[in-house]
Amino acid sequence: MTAAAAQIDMSALAHNLQKIKQQAPNSKLLAVVKANGYGHGLLNIAKGAHGVDAFGVARIEEALQLRAGGIVKQVLLLEGFYSAGDLPILVANNIQTAVHCKEQLEALENADLEGPVVVWLKVDSGMHRLGIRPEEYQEYVDRLHACKNVAQPLRYMSHFGCADELDNPTTNEQIETFMSLTDGCQGERSLAASAGLLAWPDSQLDWVRPGIIMYGVSPFSEKTAQDLGYLPTMTLTSHLIAVREVKAGESVGYGAMWTSERDTKIGVIAIGYGDGYPIAAPNGTPVLVNGRKVPVAGRVSMDMLTVDLGPDAEDNVGDEAILWGRDLPAEEVAEHIGTIAYELVTKLTSRVQMQYIP
């Protein structure tokens, strides 16, 4: 019996990708697999993501891992390259790059490369994190068109800051800014990530960039992915390693953060913050044991957490516990903890065993 394990349901991944295609039927899919495939395993997710057209990563190391693993589809560095020394690596491995600043532009202009690089010009349409400002757009376009190290035609992209907030006018403003700048351009364009492709159909351009929704987790606070017809790809599990009787008035765990108000049974589960389960999980955070939700009771330890099974519990050592995923959405757990499901799935540590289910 293993302790903590992340069961990765590859049929759920296939279902989610098919649903994305149905929602953006006229767009190519750039599947975002950064941060170790959102914690699901970079290479296994890439190999199982049948029917996508390209992959997006954040770091050049992630791109090289894809190439070393036999992935031949297009790969894009969403943040672009970090130094001029990266450029020969991009050429040698057929890796595409975003360009969002003058340092990257000048590095491309000054490089002596063996071939051109596919460039996505990243426009700051209103998020103000990365990208060239609208007033700089034409200068960048002209210089990139003139650069021998840049494959033509250029491609164009931007990123939303508030697409998960359906009442926020910023997203429509960003769409208008990006479309007005790039209208008439020869190259392909991309604007929508997960929230965009789900809620803002006008942002479904030549490419969409599904990230979190591909893994069956919602980008929206008010709806789970299952509410939207998507399936959780990850189910995080462990097992009960002890069932103990606790009397009313007795406290459990470090700092005595939880005190029982009744005689009850406590279940000890073999998972903790050393596995990536958040230490911040407060009393009451739900865990699924034998099909019912039971609350976390006491501070999460490095290797264990404790739950209140109830006075009449018939659970036994060895019974499975589900921390999130199947029948317990990660979004629900994240809300209790005061974080987002993105953080839950991406912070699992290496001692969590990855189990891939066809």
UniProtKB/Swiss-Prot annotation:
UniProt keyword ATP-binding present: no
InterPro entries given for it?
Ala_racemase (IPR000821), Ala_racemase/Decarboxylase_C (IPR009006), Ala_racemase_C (IPR011079), Ala_racemase_N (IPR001608), Ala_racemase_pyridoxalP-BS (IPR020622), PLP-binding_barrel (IPR029066)
Task: Please state the Enzyme Commission number of this protein.
Answer: 5.1.1.1
Gene3D superfamilies on file: Alanine racemase (3.20.20.10), Lyase, Ornithine Decarboxylase, Chain A, domain 1 (2.40.37.10)
Binding-site positions, substrate: 129, 302
Gene Ontology terms: biological process: D-alanine biosynthetic process
Write the record's keywords in alphabetical order, separated by commas: Isomerase, Pyridoxal phosphate
An example of a GO molecular function for this protein is: alanine racemase activity
Q: Which PANTHER family match?
A: ALANINE RACEMASE, ALANINE RACEMASE, BIOSYNTHETIC
The name this protein carries in UniProt is: Alanine racemase
The taxonomy runs: Bacteria, Pseudomonadati, Pseudomonadota, Gammaproteobacteria, Vibrionales
